[in-house]
């Protein structure tokens, strides 16, 4: 099929609408089950369900005249009207003990379960048996005519009933047959139908308790009980790693990040676009599996990760050194393996490794030799990342480091894209100052006015990182507030005749005074980052 912009867009919207409906249906089922368990008094089971889903189901309640029992009764009534019999919802298990055990191949005695009979062909039972006793022996003509009648009766009997409960009558040849008229092909607007379906699904989803863009805290994770292939020890480690799945909403959008256009574009190419347009990312165009953000502290590396957690519909693992480093022998490499297995299990997912140099420093550089446990953990991490590169799982590793020259060379090879998140430019600094100190800013009951020359201040803040500029703006806004404290503390009388609070205007000179006492945190490291970029850059 020929690809076009409209086809890709409509395909993405249809897939997104289907996923939204499926997600809403699963959540509604869980809420219905929780409501039924609570109403029937199964409090322990309801508590276990709420803990395993980690959704906070108590925040929602079932609408009026809706419950699980009513839905089942309505289904039974519908089934009876359609098929003239009640549905069989449950059946007795042949052997519950043996069904839970893994099946072994090569055994002599094998039981045939009901699942193995599902693919057998259905036998069409005839309603009435054709009469054959009226045929006289030796009458060849009558036998042929009777066999023809039997064949027609069997055909009619088989066509009378279908698996869908429909009665079909045969059209006999003696009826007058209309002359077949040639019909022109009907023009069907598939694009319009698809667009209407998408709009209907989206509006239905929005009206059905949940919003179109749910928070990460409302994301329905797969239960760990379905995590196949792990023993009890691995299940415990999986529970430890699952605590670092980011289920909070940082509320950081792409537009909230000033600058960093190249980094945002590459993150979108690796995480967002492969999910939206999978047709484009095949073969040599497979998405990136690893991306390294390096640069001075306070330039927005972690902010990019928060934007990924907010904007991208992936399971976000926020991993630090304390997550995968253990004092027990062999547990560190097991934690690394479980981390990547969980990421594949919850795919599409993103693994964010902050302060990567604390985990993947260069091997063989420690005087006296590196600890054996640390070497095993690093080796396992490299092996797992190699497995990601060879697989088609939508698992992406996003790493951040302030000291990229301390990273192991093998890790650099696996991080395909390496982007320098440098100090903000003059335009970015001016936009940051305007964002934090606009001409009029109202914070609850206080209203702060400023008279700043933003272009002059952006030149004076050269060498400051984004966090440094935020600190300077906060200190400049705090100066007029300090005068309020002196008025409140010096007035010891019990009378309420205090003047109304009015903050002084923050001027350019106030900002420059704050700059004189607030120095940049990483100005001296700029040349070293640029030198490392010339050797190891990969954009």
UniProtKB/Swiss-Prot annotation:
Sample GO molecular function, one term: ATP binding
Catalytic activity: n ATP + n H2O + a microtubule = n ADP + n phosphate + (n+1) alpha/beta tubulin heterodimers
GO biological process terms held by the UniProt record: microtubule severing
Ranges where the record places region Disordered: 93-121
Annotated EC: 5.6.1.1
Domain spans labelled LisH: 25-57
Record-listed ATP binding positions: 295-302
Sorted UniProt keywords: ATP-binding, Cytoplasm, Cytoskeleton, Isomerase, Microtubule, Nucleotide-binding
Compartments reported by the entry: Cytoplasm, Cytoskeleton; Cytoplasm; Cytoplasm, Cytoskeleton, Spindle; Cytoplasm, Cytoskeleton, Spindle pole
Keyword ATP-binding: yes
GO cellular component, one term: spindle pole
Gene3D superfamilies: 1.10.8.60, P-loop containing nucleotide triphosphate hydrolases
Keyword Secreted attributed: no
Cross-referenced PANTHER family: AAA DOMAIN-CONTAINING, KATANIN P60 ATPASE-CONTAINING SUBUNIT A-LIKE 2
Function, in words: Severs microtubules in vitro in an ATP-dependent manner. This activity may promote rapid reorganization of cellular microtubule arrays.
Family label: Belongs to the AAA ATPase family. Katanin p60 subunit A1 subfamily. A-like 2 sub-subfamily.
Name of the protein this chain belongs to: Katanin p60 ATPase-containing subunit A-like 2
């Amino acid at each position: 099929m020929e690809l076009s912009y409209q086809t890709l867009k409509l395909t993405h919207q249809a897939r997104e609408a289907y996923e939204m409906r499926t997600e809403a249906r699963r959540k509604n089922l869980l809420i219905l089950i929780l409501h039924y368990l609570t109403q029937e008094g199964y409090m322990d089971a309801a508590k276990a369900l709420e803990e395993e889903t980690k959704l906070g189901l108590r925040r929602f309640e079932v609408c009026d005249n809706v419950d699980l029992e009513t839905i089942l009764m309505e289904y039974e009534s519908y089934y009876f009207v359609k098929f003239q019999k009640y549905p069989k919802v449950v059946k007795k298990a042949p052997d519950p003990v043996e069904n839970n055990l893994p099946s072994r191949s090569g055994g002599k005695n094998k039981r045939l379960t009901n699942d193995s009979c599902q693919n057998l062909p259905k036998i069409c039972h005839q309603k009435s048996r054709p009469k054959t006793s009226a045929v006289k022996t030796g009458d060849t003509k009558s036998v042929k005519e009777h066999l023809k009648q039997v064949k027609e009766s069997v055909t009619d009997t088989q066509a009378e009933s279908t698996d869908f409960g429909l009665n079909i009558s045969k059209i006999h040849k003696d009826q007058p047959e209309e002359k077949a008229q040639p019909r022109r092909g009907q023009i069907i607007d598939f694009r319009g139908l698809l667009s209407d379906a998408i709009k209907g699904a989206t509006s239905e989803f929005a009206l059905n308790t949940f919003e179109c863009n749910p928070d990460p805290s409302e994301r329905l994770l797969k239960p760990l009980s379905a995590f196949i292939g792990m023993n009890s020890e691995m299940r415990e480690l999986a529970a430890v790693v699952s605590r670092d799945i980011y289920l909070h909403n940082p509320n950081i959008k792409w537009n909230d990040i000033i600058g960093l256009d190249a980094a945002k574009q590459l993150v979108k190419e690796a995480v967002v676009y492969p999910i939206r347009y999978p047709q484009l990312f095949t073969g040599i165009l497979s998405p990136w599996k690893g991306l390294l953000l390096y640069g001075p502290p306070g330039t927005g590396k972690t902010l990019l990760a928060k934007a990924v957690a907010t904007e991208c519909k992936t399971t976000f693992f926020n991993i630090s050194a304390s997550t995968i480093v253990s004092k027990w022998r062999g547990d560190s490499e097991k934690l690394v393996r479980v981390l990547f297995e969980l990421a594949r299990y919850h795919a599409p997912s993103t693994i964010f490794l902050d302060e990567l140099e604390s985990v993947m420093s260069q091997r063989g550089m420690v005087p006296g030799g590196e600890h054996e446990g640390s070497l095993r953990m690093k080796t396992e991490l490299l092996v797992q990342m190699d497995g990601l590169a060879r697989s088609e799982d939508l698992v992406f590793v996003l790493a951040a480091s302030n000291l990229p020259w301390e990273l192991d060379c093998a890790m650099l090879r696996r991080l395909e894209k390496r982007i320098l998140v440098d100090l903000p430019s003059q335009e970015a600094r001016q936009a940051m100052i305007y964002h934090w100190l606009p001409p009029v800013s109202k914070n609850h009951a206080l209203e702060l006015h400023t008279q700043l020359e933003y272009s002059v201040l952006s030149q004076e803040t050269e060498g400051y990182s984004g966090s440094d500029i935020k600190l300077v703006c906060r200190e400049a806004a705090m100066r007029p507030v300090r005068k309020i404290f002196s008025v409140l503390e010096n007035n010891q009388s019990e009378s309420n005749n205090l003047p109304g609070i009015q903050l002084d205007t923050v001027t350019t000179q106030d900002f420059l005074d704050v700059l004189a006492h607030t120095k940049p945190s990483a100005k001296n490291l700029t040349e070293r980052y640029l030198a490392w970029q010339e050797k190891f850059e990969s954009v």
